[in-house]
Amino acid sequence: MIAVIMLLSFTSAYAQEAEETSDSAGWWQQTKNRLGNIADNGAEEVYLSGYAYHGRNTYTPERIRELNEKAWGIGGGRTFRNADGNDESLYFFGIRDSHFKPQLMAGYAYEWVFSVPKTPIEFSAGYTAMLVSRQDYFGGFPFPLPLPIAGIGTKKAKLMASYIPRLSSNKGNGDVLLLFARFEVD
């Protein structure tokens, strides 16, 4: 019985000490804190999509005529300009995919921002990690997808691009450049 009490006392003291240490939060708590900060303090944004370019060396002219390159869509999100001057975003987005079906996306993006001196213009480059739901993959079940992103514009309005690479030597998949705009509405 004394051993159990000593063990519980030791465990309790150890747990309290761990809670007081800033490094003890761990990656899960740090991730939750970061995402919570974006959600609470980020600027509200609207996303508009309109064009998906399919690589002409990947698809035959006949196939390109069958594909939808007018990837109309809308979404929303929040972007927080962090202490390093870079953008972190949480977003959701729905577009009409290459096969005229709905494609739903939700994710996180990180962009390193490079300002043009003495102008409001800035360039950005980074990555996004998202969950995507498409009818032609996994029956619409969401799957993870990391992609590169880039942008040009101002803090309040940017033309953005993301590239879906060709993942195999087979022609007819990937090699798509998606263009969209991001507008701050706060």
Model-derived segments and spans:
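Residues on the lipid-exposed face of transmembrane beta-strands in outer-membrane beta-barrel proteins
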Residues: 48, 74-78, 92, 106-112, ...
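Transmembrane beta-strands of outer-membrane beta-barrel proteins
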Residues: 47-51, 91-93, 124-130, 160-164, ...
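Short glycine/proline- and aromatic-enriched beta-strand/turn motifs that initiate or cap beta-hairpins
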Residues: 15-78
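Residues that define the transmembrane beta-barrel architecture of outer-membrane proteins
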Residues: 68-74, 100-106, 141-146, 153-155, ...
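Short loop/turn motifs that connect adjacent beta-strands in outer-membrane beta-barrel proteins
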Residues: 33-43, 81-87, 113-124, 186
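Outer-membrane beta-barrel "beta-signal"
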Residues: 52-54, 174-186
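Sequence/structural signature of outer-membrane beta-barrel proteins
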Residues: 53-58, 95-99, 115, 130-136, ...
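Repeated loop/turn-to-beta-strand initiation elements of outer-membrane beta-barrel proteins
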Residues: 82-88, 156-161
